[in-house]
């Protein structure tokens, strides 16, 4: 490996501001801010959405109508099928 070309890999604290949750993750992100957690100082990054707050991961997502578009079409226009023209 060539010296001095690889980014520094370290543990970084990401703060999900919408859920007020802190997550420690290994990362190469550069940051100016630091935070102290559990007596240890870590680089600190704020984020708006993470798996702690995203509706898909929390199970609080909106449910959509389970009726398919084909079923809706049949309900609206099914009576035209098989009708005699005349």
Swiss-Prot record:
The keyword Ribosomal protein applies. One of its GO terms (cellular component) is ribonucleoprotein complex. The keyword Ribonucleoprotein applies. Keywords: Ribonucleoprotein, Ribosomal protein. It comes from the Bacteria. Belongs to the bacterial ribosomal protein bL31 family. Type B subfamily. PANTHER family: 50S RIBOSOMAL PROTEIN L31, CHLOROPLASTIC (PTHR33280), LARGE RIBOSOMAL SUBUNIT PROTEIN BL31C (PTHR33280:SF1). This is Large ribosomal subunit protein bL31B. It comes from Salmonella typhi.
């Amino acid at each position: 490996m060539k010296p001095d070309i690889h980014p520094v890999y370290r543990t970084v604290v990401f703060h999900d501001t919408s859920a007020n949750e802190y997550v420690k993750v290994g990362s190469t992100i550069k940051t100016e801010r630091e935070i102290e957690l559990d007596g240890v100082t870590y680089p600190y990054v704020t984020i708006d959405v993470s798996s702690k707050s995203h509706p898909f991961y929390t199970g609080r997502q909106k449910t959509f109508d389970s009726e398919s578009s084909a079923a809706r079409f049949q309900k609206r226009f099914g009576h035209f099928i098989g009708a005699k023209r005349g």
